[in-house]
């Protein structure tokens, strides 16, 4: 029996879209993450779509980002931005809230948040 992917465990495309949209809604509405919001364009439509496509594949679903843009090269794509531990923590604050609003299962929350943290931490490009 094949193990289900996180994408399948979450419920597929609709749930990944909700998670992405909620993440950005939190970023837009929480003044404590304004420096993170300021790293993004005024119109978040393209950012929302790219994160949705990335998360789809990253979670084990359709590789939408790769099909459209090629390999994600996350660190390279984030090099124009000063990503330090504060930016990582703001990103995680938004994602943590979105994941906690979405999921009831503690084991799945913990698994996802650990993976998100590891990825967000890898994005840091500023010496501290």
List where the protein language model places each region.
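Core of compact, soluble alpha-helical bundle domains
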Residues: 1-128
């Amino acid at each position: 029996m094949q193990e289900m992917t996180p994408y399948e465990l979450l419920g597929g495309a609709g749930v990944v879209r909700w998670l992405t949209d909620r993440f950005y809604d939190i970023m837009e509405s929480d003044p404590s993450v304004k420096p993170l919001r300021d790293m993004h364009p005024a119109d978040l439509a393209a950012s929302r779509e790219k994160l949705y496509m990335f998360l789809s594949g990253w979670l084990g679903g359709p590789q939408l980002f790769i099909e459209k843009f090629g390999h994600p090269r996350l660190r390279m794509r984030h090099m124009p931005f000063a990503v330090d531990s504060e930016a990582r923590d703001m990103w995680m604050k938004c994602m943590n809230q979105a994941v906690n609003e979405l999921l009831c299962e503690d084991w799945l929350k913990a698994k996802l948040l650990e993976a998100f943290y590891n990825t967000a931490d890898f994005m840091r490009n500023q010496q501290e």
